């Protein structure tokens, strides 16, 4: 049986986390040459590349499996040695989450564990359709995703849903939708997407108005909070979680352009199995808070 050197695995992990050999070497307090040598030793042991040397570097399929193994071992070490290591460096938890969860409910949900446990968060923002892939690659130990099925050797629980409303400022609505929200008026109204793969706005318009993808003018802005600002200042119409704009809707600063219609995104919490004591507390915090603020199946 091939048994990897965990110092070499930590070097591989550092290169992926730090997005390069130089920063990985600084993080590990060794030379770049030493980082390269450790990874080369691993590759020789397994007889195949573990790293695609792109910018930034990416793990191969075998590299992903080894990173997942490392993270599971770290979780198990924390579980069995946590009390003895209570004064050591805080445990690093890398999580892949969607921007809207980060902007609304995630940080309040994590507040209890952040104040009670010695952990360091490494939050990686990704679309909820792609966060699970980061868990598959071993880049994170937990992910918030729309995928209901667990990966092999992983656990999954339903968190609840974010309901997205199609909103704009009253001024924007008057300029573009004075005669109602119609197919023709939507073709002229600028929208906004998080990135080029974010199709929520287009999917909503296609489903409810029959508009083909790509037919609406659309800004690209990588910030959930910026969506709210753009809508409030009358620059765009967009899909925003009700949870994020409840106050603006109540005050009339934003209006729901299509009352009765929403786009529901059910979210799931994925993580490696078995869970350590710390990870179990993170899971409990997310599930407890999610049940309070996110929409559940029966709602």
Curated annotation (Swiss-Prot):
Keywords linked to the UniProt accession: DNA-binding, Transcription, Transcription regulation
Lineage: superkingdom: Bacteria
Name listed for the protein in its UniProt record: HTH-type transcriptional regulator ArgP
Keyword DNA-binding: yes
Record note on quaternary structure: Homodimer.
PROSITE patterns (UniProt xref): HTH_LYSR
Pfam families: HTH_1 (PF00126), LysR_substrate (PF03466)
Gene responsible for this protein: argP
DNA-binding region(s), chain positions: 21-40
GO molecular function: DNA binding; DNA-binding transcription factor activity
Role this protein plays: Controls the transcription of genes involved in arginine and lysine metabolism.
